[in-house]
Amino acid sequence: MSKEQTLSQPSSRVSFKELQQIIKMGLVQGNLIPAFAGAWLAVVMSNHSFLSSIPQILLMLIGSTLIMGGACALNNYYDQDIDRIMPSKQNRPTVNDRISDKNLLILSFGMMLLGEACLFLLNVPSGVLGLIGIVGYVSYYSIWSKRHTTWNTVVGSFPGAVPPLIGWVAIDGNISLIAIALFLVVFCWQPIHFYALAIKRSDEYSLANIPMLPSVKGFKRTRISMFIWLVFLLPLPFLLSSLGTTFVVLATLLNLGWLYVGLTSFKKATDQTKWATKMFIYSLNYLVVFFVLVVVISLIKMI
């Protein structure tokens, strides 16, 4: 067997770092924050004991990690053709043949089945929401909208916003206005976050023939869309007024700060990529700060 043939065969083992790439662990971890916040708020608002709820919360987090990781692995399987074209994806194990398609599918479906088992052990609503998230991300986003419409980011935002709902129903069993408010925050946050990333990688998406908004409609249209979604975020803290005035004020300032950064940095930026980078960095911090506020302020109210 030649050296070239040996190198082209998928490795029988992948490293832990490569496994993290396959299941998109960074994305998974980011979604666990709102999932935990949803469960935490359900504990607080329904007067459950936090200590007695720890097993439910842990099972919810494990189940959520598994279904999200499995869905992301399946996304990587389906996207291999376009990932091979995009320069930023060349280190993915699915692109450089570090894992076979067979093992990738076993990993993906195994994780999703185990994750769904965990969520259904909690209650039926948690399991159903998990299924909605999987089907929405894999079918409606990855297979359909990502390759066919500039609305792909918005379509993908729906399953991407399911984690706080899963967190809430894992404890409460029913969806409430508070849970819907958390869902809407994550839903409106995602287009801004991913449009900023799409601006940074506009040339790559064009090369791969993926109809991301910046690649098809241009920077101006994308920037307008980002500001529209920012405006949609502005009233959402008021849906969480049960957390108190302090939370509403701080969350509103967080929203206004993002709007301010978007408006002022655009005037100063010498190119659109620098502006998109600032918006992207703020988006990463925004989600963490918002849900930390949710947890901390509700904890203070308990005390």
UniProtKB/Swiss-Prot annotation:
Intrachain disulfide bonds: none
Question: Which InterPro entries does its entry note?
Answer: Protohaem_IX_farnesylTrfase (IPR006369), UbiA_prenyltransferase (IPR000537), UbiA_sf (IPR044878)
Question: Subcellular location, in the record's words?
Answer: Cell membrane
EC numbers, comma separated: 2.5.1.141
Which reactions does this protein catalyse? heme b + (2E,6E)-farnesyl diphosphate + H2O = Fe(II)-heme o + diphosphate
Bilayer topology annotation: Multi-pass membrane protein
Pathway field of the UniProt record reads: Porphyrin-containing compound metabolism; heme O biosynthesis; heme O from protoheme: step 1/1
Identify the Gene3D superfamilies for this entry.
Answer: UbiA prenyltransferase
Gene Ontology MF terms: protoheme IX farnesyltransferase activity
Q: What protein name applies here?
A: Protoheme IX farnesyltransferase
Species of origin: Staphylococcus haemolyticus (strain JCSC1435)
